[in-house]
Amino acid sequence: MSGATLLKESGPREVFCGLTSIVWLHRRMPDAFFLVVGSRTCAHLIQSAAGVMIFAEPRFGTAILEERDLAGLADAHDELNRVVKNLLARRPEIKTLFLVGSCPSEVIKIDLSRVAENLNIELKGQVTVLNYSGSGIETTFTQGEDGALKALIPLMPKSDQKKLLLVGTLANAVEDRLTSIFNRLGIDKVESFPPRQSTELPSIGPETKVLLTQPYLTDTARELKNKGAEIIEAPFPLGVTGSTLWIQAAADSFGIEKSLVDSILNPLISRAKQALIPHVEKLSGKKLFLLPESQLEIPLARFLSNECGMEIIEIGTPYLNRDLMKAEIDLLPPDCRIVEGQHVERQLDRVRDSSPDLVVCGMGLANPLEAEGISTKWSIEMVFSPIHGIDQASDLAELFSRPLRRHDILNPKTLTSN
């Protein structure tokens, strides 16, 4: 492991809860529906984050817990059964229903696993009902996807077929490009999890080699390993270097000659490095502070430091899985400081003391920091943007160069001179 300093911190946090992951999961699996069992606050969060008006009938919704439910004056389990049956009668196209726990449902101890089990018995296979927690008590932001995928794993059929399984939600176009690269390398059987239809789950077995596309899938990786799959150790496919090493790790696992890998990737690498140049010119030498939210912070810091020349002040991450992150940490500059967890007040003090050029943070902290004259980039944009793979390296860099260009245009000196 590199000489990076690993620290832990606890205290008040400023992060999204795991419900937010519904925003990209419901787009990935259009035959699934995500029913949050929560409050009106939960409903407003999901609707606002998704940017979808509720009358458009999106593939998510909230079963609102009223005061009667919270006070124990109504049987919340019976009420939830009624809501689910009404939903399925109105939306017969639903094939998989996720019951998603929230802070209120966790506090009053609604047993969503029992509700799901009873509904599966009643529905007799017409719809598969699953449950997981998106509660802010238990999860942060991207961990919602980890919970959803873990819930699907018991349904995956067994197979002894040799295959590569890409695990973690990707933009469809990015997934297609990466699959094409693996096919050209001679890996014919490439599948993705989650699939594009919730009912078309990939099979899994001892000949399944898992390549994680996202760093926040700790529970999913553990469950897949328990099913006999092999987890390929690699950095994550962000930037030219990370994506190249990620693809090379898969090729090595399948015994593919490096010369073939180089012949296919070198033209892509050359184009990507050329496209990075204008962004590197803007980012090089700038100081970066990453506050914890998405668990993408370490791979992002590696890319921005090694390929864009940024100076990393601190890398905050909500949780640190040292096994999944080992390849990433090994690539970091030796003087990096990684802080797992968060005490938001102390962290903000360190931000102000270090005078960064750019802070990567959650939406709740961005406006206050901008008001203090500190340029910010929302963490949530990394999850919603197609940033994976060699081809996307310049798009990823642009997400960080853009706020610096905006700051140059809007800084007080510019405004005064004009």
Curated annotation (Swiss-Prot):
One of its GO terms (molecular function) is oxidoreductase activity, acting on iron-sulfur proteins as donors. One of its GO terms (biological process) is photosynthesis, dark reaction. Pathway: Porphyrin-containing compound metabolism; chlorophyll biosynthesis (light-independent). The keyword ATP-binding applies. It holds the Pfam family Oxidored_nitro. InterPro entries: LIPOR_BchN/ChlN, Nase/OxRdtase_comp1, Protochl_reductN. It catalyses: chlorophyllide a + oxidized 2[4Fe-4S]-[ferredoxin] + 2 ADP + 2 phosphate = protochlorophyllide a + reduced 2[4Fe-4S]-[ferredoxin] + 2 ATP + 2 H2O. Its cofactor is [4Fe-4S] cluster. [4Fe-4S] cluster binds at C17, C42, C103. Keywords: 4Fe-4S, ATP-binding, Chlorophyll biosynthesis, Iron, Iron-sulfur, Metal-binding, Nucleotide-binding, Oxidoreductase, Photosynthesis. Its EC number is 1.3.7.7. Belongs to the BchN/ChlN family. This is Light-independent protochlorophyllide reductase subunit N. It comes from Prochlorococcus marinus (strain NATL2A).
